[in-house]
Amino acid sequence: DSAEILLPPTNSIELAKKLLEDLPTGGKTPMVHGLITAYQLTKSYLRKDSQSLPIMVIISDCRPNVPWQETPYYDYRYNEVGYPKVIEEVLSMAQFIQSEGQIKSLVIEVDERYDHMSKGRDIAEAMGAQYFRIQDLKAKGIIRLLRSR
């Protein structure tokens, strides 16, 4: 499993808005892969333009269920051993991103359910990021939020 970049670095708020409206949902959540991919992309961008002030926007159901490396556990969401390991990997990567100090972040949780499986707040806290739930924002609200950064 791997992460997919839906929006490469851009200054175009309009492009971001269009992509947000067509955001696919469902399936597995390889969150640690997503954080690593976003971090690498952002660092690469900073090497090209050290004066820029990028904002890493993580839009996810924030229910990580795919480990960094495959293990023998079948369903990571409900496995007593595998699931805590997945969460530990995600939070460790989030803390690493925060420790770098160069990258501002936002975490937007798109799953409307909020229970013990919801890790958006924990991920945002570990990243030093602002946290939002999608039902509290609409596309226009997200765009306003990004413009205010």
What is each stretch, according to the model?
Residues 1-22, 42-47, 68-71, 116-123, ...:
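Short beta-strand-loop
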Residues 13, 17, 35, 87-90:
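Amphipathic alpha-helical segments in well-structured domains
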Residues 27-35:
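Phosphate/oxyanion-binding active-site loops and adjacent basic polyanion-contact surfaces
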Residues 48-53:
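Short helix-terminating capping/connector loops at secondary-structure junctions
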